[in-house]
Amino acid sequence: MHILNLGAGGFIGSHLTQRLLSEGHSVTAVDLWQEKVEDLLANPRLKFIRQDIREPGWNLDRLVQQADLVIDLIAYANPGLYIRIPLEVFRLNFTENLKIAEACVRHGKRLIQFSTCEVYGRSAASIETANLVDPEDPIHATFSEDRSEFILGPVCKHRWIYASAKQLLERVLHAYGLEHGFRYTIIRPFNFIGPKIDFLLSEREGIPRVFSFFMDALINGGQMKLVDGGTQRRCYTYIDDAIECTYRIVENPRGVCERQIFNIGSPYNEVSIRQMAEMMREIYAEKFAAPGAVLPDIVSVSGDEFYGKGYEDSDRRIPDITKARTLLGWEPKWNFRGLLEATMRYYVMEHRRAQKVEALQ
């Protein structure tokens, strides 16, 4: 197939592009950044286009028309941005992505749309005040694609604009399927992690995602900051597991993925953010730190202090992956410690390589 991969230069997009090429597909990759696919650019089946999709007049229709399949990964997916530039987050995640979907409708092309597990919002236990729900029972935080309610916070907590934009896009895709027979599949990722996930804070300005923030503190010094105590729980999924499931959706055996939504995540890897920080310190001390090295302190800060006013978070979310198991025969393989160590090793090796290059200059 010839596949148009929009957002191919990001974390998920770069790994997916590599897999698509390894399976023999040709790929037109569109992104603002090419650093994460630099090692793939020599492949004759890859065409990389540096493009900001917000610019007027770019050749979206022609690229969609030439493709057999369109994959859309383009998004602002960083809580710091939801707080600082909520309008731009909405415009990119809904308005610009809707243009891509409508181009697919016009030209009769199948679309794989990456959404987010954040559409589920908060768990039922987090808003129940009569003590009728056991907050420790995972059933109250396990989310199903076609049955679970969406529980988002108040409008003044504009952190939820990202989830709202993604949810609205999902609903429009569903409507196009109903009224126009549009062929789409929606993916809701649950906290993918792996090499190339993010930048380290010492390398550039901004607020990276939590793993990269902790990793930077371990490598370069500083505190491992837990937002609101790090009590939030997440189910982490190694990128290799995630890409395997995504590729099965690309293959679409017997058409089982048509107009379906899939959770991709590992329900077995639930940890609190505090537990993650503690395990990263433990692994770093055991595997990577110099003898006698001083490890960073783990400290708690408020969400308002770390991100700014308007921050709120989901307390807990666990994916129900029954659909992926049943329709795709997929099961995640990586446990939490294994995926954490593998990802940390990548960043440590990259840091050491950069140090050697710098020493030679």
How should these model regions be labeled?
Residues I3-E23:
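N-terminal Rossmann NAD(P)H-binding glycine-rich loop of SDR-like oxidoreductase domains
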Residues H25-Q34:
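Conserved glycine-rich Rossmann-like NAD(P)H-binding loop of the short-chain dehydrogenase/reductase
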Residues P44-P56:
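Rossmann-fold cofactor-recognition segment
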Residues L98-I161, T185:
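Conserved Rossmann-fold NAD(P)-dependent oxidoreductase catalytic core, especially the SDR/UDP-sugar
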Residues I161, A165-L168:
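Active-site helix of classical SDR
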